[in-house]
Amino acid sequence: MVITLYSKAGCHLCDEARTLLENVAADADFELDEIDIRRDAALFERYRYRIPVIAIDGAEALEGRFDERDVLAAINRGEAT
């Protein structure tokens, strides 16, 4: 399973999401891929007001504010598909 975190520097919610995902990684088996939306104009346009955004195996799962329970539920849904 690959979890992609769409983020950008200076985004405190993105920093919180990264830390949360790093903590969850201790109990869940996934590869974390972080993408800075400022490096791609299309991604910036798509996500700039929504970050942080988490995608699981390419499917958007969470955005904005979320907690560990939300992440674990999204991971479980991703494993079920």
Features from the language model and the residues they span:
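Generic recognition of short, well-ordered alpha-helical segments
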Residues: E16-T19, R46, F66
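Non-catalytic, surface beta->alpha helical segment in thiol-disulfide oxidoreductase systems
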Residues: G58-T81
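Structural micro-motif
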Residues: R48-I54
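Local sequence-structure signature of Cys/Sec-based thiol-disulfide redox active-site neighborhoods
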Residues: M1-N23
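A short, glycine- and basic residue-enriched loop/turn
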Residues: K8-G10, A41, I51
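N-terminal, polar/charged subdomain of small-to-medium soluble alpha/beta proteins
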Residues: D27, F44, R65-D67
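Thiol-based oxidoreductase modules, predominantly thioredoxin-like and allied folds used
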Residues: F30-A41
